[in-house]
Regions:
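Intrinsically disordered, low-complexity regulatory regions of eukaryotic proteins
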Residues: 1-239
Length: 239
């Protein structure tokens, strides 16, 4: 089957994890790619597009994506321009009108809760990532070569494993989902067992009785375990 433009990043991520010395969740690689692309987009020319500014003014950004925007070493002017209009929008929406006794602050609390839960980058990434999950399931169902690539994966993080199962259950025929679940679960069972052993060995290495023993795969087991439990890219830990 000829490769489509929307399958290219998925195949590249699943290839990269097989080539990497460090086990990684391919879906975490895809999410990180989407985040970086979106950050580059909104701190570039898209920042001045009216429809983009309307959304960034309204939604703002979460702390993680603020940190990604300011941590790239580029000019902070695009960020400042977005902040200028976002702060003005926030002031107008939350602090204009009403009195101190208007619901005893309940309305402001509701608005603040909505703002806190919103992020322009998160909403864009989540939408694109949801489509990518659907494509992963489509490739599993229709392409034998991708199915082999999937079965060769070393791990998925727990949050993405949950999403994979939900997407598979919603989109695959019942019999095929059973196979998908079995393969995915085998990958996870093998990795969590190995990871648990690596973390245990890391702990043992702080016992003087194990001083002369090699580290094996335990040196990076703590960040790997955190990324497995919460999501993250292992191969970027030391960059």
């Amino acid at each position: 089957m000829a490769e489509k433009i929307y399958t290219i990043p998925i195949n590249e991520a699943f290839d990269k994890t097989l080539e990497s010395e460090t086990p990684d969740c391919p879906l975490c690689l895809l999410r990180r790619m989407l985040e970086k692309n979106e950050i580059e987009r909104i701190t570039g020319a898209a920042m001045m597009e009216p429809d983009v500014r309307i959304e960034t003014n309204k939604k703002g950004f979460c702390r993680r994506h603020f940190d990604m925007m300011t941590g790239g070493g580029g000019s902070r002017l695009p960020i400042a321009l977005m902040l200028e209009s976002h702060i003005a929008e926030t002031e107008k929406e939350i602090f204009s009108g009403g009195t101190l006794f208007d619901g005893k602050g309940a309305k402001e609390e509701e608005k603040l809760a909505r703002l806190e839960a919103s992020c322009y980058v998160c909403s864009r990434v989540d939408d694109a990532f949801s489509k990518m999950l659907g494509t992963v399931i489509y490739l599993w169902e229709n392409e034998e070569q991708f199915r082999e690539k999937y079965e060769a994966q070393r791990c998925f993080c727990l949050p993405d494993y949950k999403l994979l199962l939900a997407a598979g259950r919603d989109n695959l025929p019942k019999k095929m989902f059973g196979e998908f679940f079995s393969v995915s679960r085998d990958i996870m069972k093998k990795y969590i067992h190995e990871l648990g052993g690596d973390v245990s060995w890391f702990c043992k290495k702080f016992d003087y009785r194990y001083d002369s023993e090699p580290w094996y795969n335990a040196k990076d087991s703590v960040p790997r375990a955190i990324n497995f439990l919460s999501g993250g890219v292992n191969s970027e830990e030391n960059k």
